[in-house]
Amino acid sequence: MTSGTHVAFASVLYLGGATLFGYKPDVVGWLLAATASLGPDVDLPTSKVGRLLFWLSVPLERRFGHRTVTHSAVGLLVVALVASPLWWVRPLYFWCVLGGTWSHLWIDMLNVRGADLFWPSPVRVVAPGNRNWRLEVGSKAEMVLLSVLLLLTVARTRPGHGTRYGAQTPMPSTAGRCRTHQCERGFREQ
């Protein structure tokens, strides 16, 4: 899948998780999930993260190939260990990194090739079972999926996140203070 599809899918899962689990979405968590959704492609030197971390990407691809160790439960465990300090800072951020990484593995299973989720086992996980329904990287079908994911992301974004009213969301209500302030200045509540 393309990096845009990975980021869009992680965004949908992050915002959907806010509804499901009741946490308040914030920009840091969203960025962590989106960034982590690109992480498993570190084993591909031509990917965005592979170009950034070329010193790690090239040896990983030579030794293991693409969609093997970094797209497996072993890779997910390594990410969990590396991200574990976030648990002590803010547990939600730990889950954002883990969820973003998992979203990458999950959506790559929709690809024709699938993912080696149980690496080093040769079992490859693909979905759906019908090969004709799987997606080619960069195909029209993937662009349709990307469009749907972007629409879902926009639909899940609450007003006040990135709009001109964005500053109102983090600010506490001043309704009680205004009444108190008005009463102190001699105004009587009717």
Residue ranges and their predicted role:
Residues 1-190:
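N-terminal membrane-targeting hydrophobic helices
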